[in-house]
């Protein structure tokens, strides 16, 4: 062991930092601390000194490599890394690696140092972001200090600095994902800064707590569109609260929001809810002439995600009067129906549309989409329609129809094989 360290020190004297890293990697280091017992305290101290030298003088890759080794050298690395992190004259890249590594240690001194870095108005953005991420990695030990940063101060001279610090604190709490982070996050859902409210709502959405559902519902009416959007996203995953909090009726008004992004997220949420009431709300907006095309695409996607009899019937109705772009989307989505009980219905909808004589059905792209979707659904009732499309004058339609027929034929053969084997065995 002493030989490896001697070689590493010789390489350091020659400023060959790549070789120093290679020698340090050969030491019997544990996953986090020196758990092997093969290195003496003196040897560990030597290894730490060499690793810190690489951090100071190596290139980016060498710093990256040695930063992965440092946590394996135990608690002894904390003090020199804190010295680097707190030295404002030190190279910012070296400080970044030091702070990132310190995020592995649940040490009060580490928490305080990282918090001070966040509070310092002169800290550059990359260092501040790293500090927030490192604090997030530290978990519950960092929550108390981060909570203090959320308290509004009379920052008359530097309100933007205070806002940025508090925003980073919220983002750090969001990464912790522990129930202890809920209370401090609840304190800022009504913050005067929309960015902080948005970050808090996004963070709280990952927790299963009855209070949070009520907070998200209230946030649907926030004046900031980013907050409304995050609230809709959060509620879309709370299907367990669907009936108790009447979430469909809470989300429905957002389908007519002034922000198209909020409208689209509301559509996604209603699609995830998958109820007939949600499908009805989606369809009402879909058939409105005032609804933008981009939102109509999201509405039909949401109806398809619901995958219910009612939602498929609404999609069928949409085929009768929608623009070609929307029709193509509906046809494609019908081909992706997974429910065995609804595949036959989706197939029948496509066949009826093909024979409806609507203007859209004469477009090659529409016929091609129908052929592809019928092939994906794999229902025998589609054979006649596909044979018609296989005789189409457009080559691309013909090729897709033939491919779909082959897929149906293969599927039919595969499904009949188990039956044939059973008959042979019984015979």
Residue ranges and their predicted role:
Residues 3, 15-19:
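Short helix-adjacent coil turns
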Residues 390-402:
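Short glycine/proline-enriched turn or capping motifs at secondary-structure junctions
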Residues 18-25, 49, 79:
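Short amphipathic alpha-helical segments
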Residues 13-16, 32, 58-59, 88-91, ...:
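Short inter-helical turns and helix N-cap capping residues of alpha-solenoid HEAT/ARM repeat scaffolds
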């Amino acid at each position: 062991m002493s030989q490896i360290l001697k070689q590493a020190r010789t390489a350091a004297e020659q400023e060959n930092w790549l070789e120093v890293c290679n020698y340090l990697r050969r030491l019997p280091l544990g996953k986090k601390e020196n758990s092997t017992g093969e290195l003496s305290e003196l040897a560990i101290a030597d290894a730490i000194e060499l690793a810190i030298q690489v951090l100071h003088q190596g290139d980016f890759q060498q710093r990256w490599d040695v930063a992965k080794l440092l946590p394996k050298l135990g608690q002894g690395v904390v003090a020199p890394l804190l010295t680097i992190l707190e030295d404002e004259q030190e190279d910012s890249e070296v400080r970044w690696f030091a702070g990132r590594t310190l995020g592995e240690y649940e040490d009060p001194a580490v928490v305080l140092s990282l918090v001070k870095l966040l509070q310092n108005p002169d800290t550059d953005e990359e260092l501040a972001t790293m500090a927030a991420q490192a604090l997030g990695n530290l978990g519950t030990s960092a929550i108390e200090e981060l909570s203090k940063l959320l308290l509004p101060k009379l920052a008359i001279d530097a309100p933007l600095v205070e806002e940025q610090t508090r925003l980073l604190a919220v983002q750090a709490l969001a990464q912790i994902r522990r129930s202890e982070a809920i209370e401090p996050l609840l304190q800022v859902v009504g913050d005067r800064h929309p960015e902080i409210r948005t970050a808090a709502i996004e963070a709280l959405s990952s927790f299963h707590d009855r209070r949070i559902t009520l907070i998200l519902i209230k946030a649907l009416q926030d004046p900031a569109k980013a907050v409304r959007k995050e609230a809709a996203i959060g509620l879309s995953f709370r299907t367990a609260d669907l009936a108790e909090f009447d979430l469909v009726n809470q989300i429905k008004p957002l389908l007519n929001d002034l922000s198209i992004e909020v409208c689209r997220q509301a559509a996604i949420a209603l699609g995830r809810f998958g109820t007939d009431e949600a499908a009805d709300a989606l369809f009402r907006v879909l058939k409105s002439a005032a609804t933008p095309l981009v939102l109509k695409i999201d509405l039909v996607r949401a109806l398809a995600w619901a995958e219910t009899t009612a939602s498929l019937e609404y999609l069928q109705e949409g085929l009768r009067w929608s623009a070609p772009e929307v029709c193509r989307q509906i046809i494609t989505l019908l081909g992706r129906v997974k429910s065995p009980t609804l595949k036959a219905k989706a197939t029948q909808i496509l066949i009826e549309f093909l024979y409806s004589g609507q203007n859209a059905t004469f477009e090659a792209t529409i016929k091609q989409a129908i052929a592809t979707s019928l092939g994906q659904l794999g229902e025998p009732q589609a054979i006649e329609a596909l044979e018609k499309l296989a005789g189409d004058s457009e080559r691309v339609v013909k090729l897709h129809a033939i491919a779909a027929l082959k897929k149906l034929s293969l599927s039919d053969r595969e499904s009949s094989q188990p039956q044939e084997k059973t008959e042979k065995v019984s015979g």
